Amino acid sequence: MDTNSRNRLIKSASYLSVTTALIILSIKLYAWVVTDSQSILAALIDSMLDITSSFINLIALRFALQPPDHHHRFGYEKLQDLTIFSQSIFFFASAFFVGFSSVKSLFEKTKPENISDGTTVMYVCIFLTIILVFYQTYVIKKTGSEIVKADKLHYFTDLLTNVIVIISINLSDYFWFVDPLFGVVISLYIFHSSYSLFKKAFKNLVDHELPEQDRQKIISIVNNHLGAKGMHEMKTRYAGQKAFIQCHLEMDGNMSLYNAHKISDEIAFEILQEFPEAEIIIHQDPFGIEEHVKYREYIVR
């Protein structure tokens, strides 16, 4: 798939996400007003975060998908990480709010009202969310977009939340504590999901190295090329879903620059098969010169 087609698909998923979130938010607001249910309130807050996240994604995509320019020669991919990081903070705040409100209802022993209206509304929300999640899954399969993956997690969480809400408000007729208790459970789930997003985005923002298994793939590729005698100063990072890989490749010092360049290109090509669209910088060094070597990768010969 070419870049323009990929970008169009990602943007279409974001537009559909915002539209669906607006509709669901309006429906849940009505449901909460007529039922006064804590679990519906939790679902409403979750939807408010979904729509906030979707708007942030839409704005970020406007910039993150732009090609590198004169002032941003590494590109704009880190905007994706900044977006996901911001979303996780919103989620932390919402988890606290929902948890606090639900615990308060547990102490006050409140029960929801107009349960049949609330149930009908939640079924409509489930139907709309399923359509959106199916389309997002299709877009992810075609593009691998991290922003759409994060957005899908929000709405998949929303889908589970809606099912839980239907169960809780219908059980609350028999057990008063079920509705606020499910509100607490949902808040804990939101907190857990937030932490996963926060951790990944934070690692990318501070230029954390690629996972060790990915680093070993790179080392193995270099190790399998007979022209490489060693490697040092390997540095890796992610920005959005794009990998940045650089290293100093050690080769026979008597080799011509042309052959050294050819070997570097061959190794870069093999790395690209494992990390499509990665930006790779390979510096050629003569083997045996230890000056300025800070750390060396282990190469088997």
UniProtKB/Swiss-Prot annotation:
State the taxonomy lineage. Bacteria, Pseudomonadati, Pseudomonadota, Alphaproteobacteria, Rickettsiales
Q: How does it sit in the membrane?
A: Multi-pass membrane protein
Please tell me the species this chain comes from: Rickettsia rickettsii (strain Sheila Smith)
* Recorded family membership: Belongs to the cation diffusion facilitator (CDF) transporter (TC 2.A.4) family.
Question: So where does this one cross the membrane?
Answer: 15-35, 40-60, 83-103, 120-140, 171-191
Database matches in NCBIfam families: CDF
PANTHER family per record: CATION-EFFLUX PUMP FIEF, MITOCHONDRIAL METAL TRANSPORTER 1-RELATED
Record's protein name:
Protein p34
What keywords are annotated for this sequence in UniProt?
Cell membrane, Membrane, Transmembrane, Transmembrane helix, Transport
Q: Which SUPFAM superfamilies match?
A: Cation efflux protein cytoplasmic domain-like, Cation efflux protein transmembrane domain-like
Main localization, broad class: membrane
Where does the record say this protein resides? Cell membrane
Domain of life here?
Bacteria
List the Gene Ontology MF annotations in alphabetical order: cadmium ion transmembrane transporter activity; ferrous iron transmembrane transporter activity; zinc efflux antiporter activity
UniProt gene name: p34
- GO cellular component annotations, sorted alphabetically? plasma membrane
Q: Name one GO biological process term.
A: intracellular zinc ion homeostasis
